[in-house]
C-alpha cells in the first residue's frame, strides 16, 4: 500500500494530486517481472557467455544474437528497481534511477526489434539473394550495423529518460513518488507524443515491415519445387517463425496499444476518462508481454543454433568426454546456411557457402559468414 512508503515521503502541499490506485497493477507487475528476472537473468547471462567465450562470435547471425542477448541482459539487470517500486507503491530511489530504468526498457524493446530485423534480413540475403548481397554478410559489416543500432537506441534513450522523471501525488497526507506512470496531459500534448510516434516508426514499424517481408520472401523461395531440401532449411524456417512469433506476441500488442493510448492522452481522438482508463488497463498487461521477450529470445538461440545447443549440452558432460571446442569459425552454429534456389549457378554458389570454413580462413571471409 502507499502507506508503506511513509518513511520515504514528505509532507504534502495542496498542488499535488491525489494518488490513483495502482496497487492491483503493481501486484501483477511484481509477479510477472519476478518470473522474468528469475529466468531471463541466468538465461541471457549464459547465452552471452556462450557467444563470447565459447563460440567467439565469428558468424554474422551470432553477432546479432550476441547483441540481442546483451540488450536483454541489460533490461533484466534493471528489474530489481522496478520490483522494489511495485512492492512499495512508491519510488524510494533517486530520480535519475527512475529515468534510467524507464529508458532501459525502451532501449531493450526497440533494440530487440532492430536486432531481430537484422537476423531476418541476413537470412533473406543468404537465401533469396546469395550472390547480390553476399558483401553485406560479413562479421565486420554485422558489427558495424550493431554499433549503429546501439547508437540509435542510445540517442532515443536521452529524451526517453527526460520524460521518465518521477511524478508526485498524495496519499493520506503524505507525498508519494510515482515512476513509469501518471504522465501529465501537458507532457503528452508536448514532447511525449512526437517522441513516441518517431520511436514507433523507426523502432517498431520499420523492423516489423522488414521482418514480415523478409520472412515471406524466404518462405516463398524455400517452398519452390527446385528449393534445396535439407534439415538446415527447416531450421532456417524455424528461426524466422520464432522471430515472427516474438514480434506478434511481445511487440505488436504493446506498441499498438501504446499508440492508441498516446492519441487518447493527447486528445487527438475524442475520448472520455473511462476510455483512457480502459486502454491503460490493457496497456499495463501488454507491457508485460513486451518485457517477456528477454525470456523468449534465449529459446530462439537454443532451438535454432546447433552450436549453441551443443555447448549447453556439453556443459553437463564429464570433462574427458567433451568434444574439442571450436574457435567459432569451423563447424559452429552451422544451421542457418545460404541456400539458393533461384537458378543452377546460384545453387552451386550457395552450396559452396554451406561448407564450414577452414581454420585458416580469415574472419571476414564470406564462407565463414554463411553459418550462424
UniProtKB/Swiss-Prot annotation:
Protein name: Lysophosphatidic acid receptor 5
InterPro entries reported in the protein's UniProt record: GPCR_Rhodpsn, GPCR_Rhodpsn_7TM
Keyword Lipoprotein: no
Gene from which this protein is expressed: Lpar5
Alphabetical list of PROSITE patterns matching this protein: G_PROTEIN_RECEP_F1_1, G_PROTEIN_RECEP_F1_2
Keyword Transmembrane helix among UniProt keywords: yes
Similarity comment: family membership: Belongs to the G-protein coupled receptor 1 family.
Described purpose of this protein according to its UniProt entry: Receptor for lysophosphatidic acid (LPA), a mediator of diverse cellular activities.
Membrane topology value: Multi-pass membrane protein
GO cellular component: plasma membrane
Record localization: Cell membrane
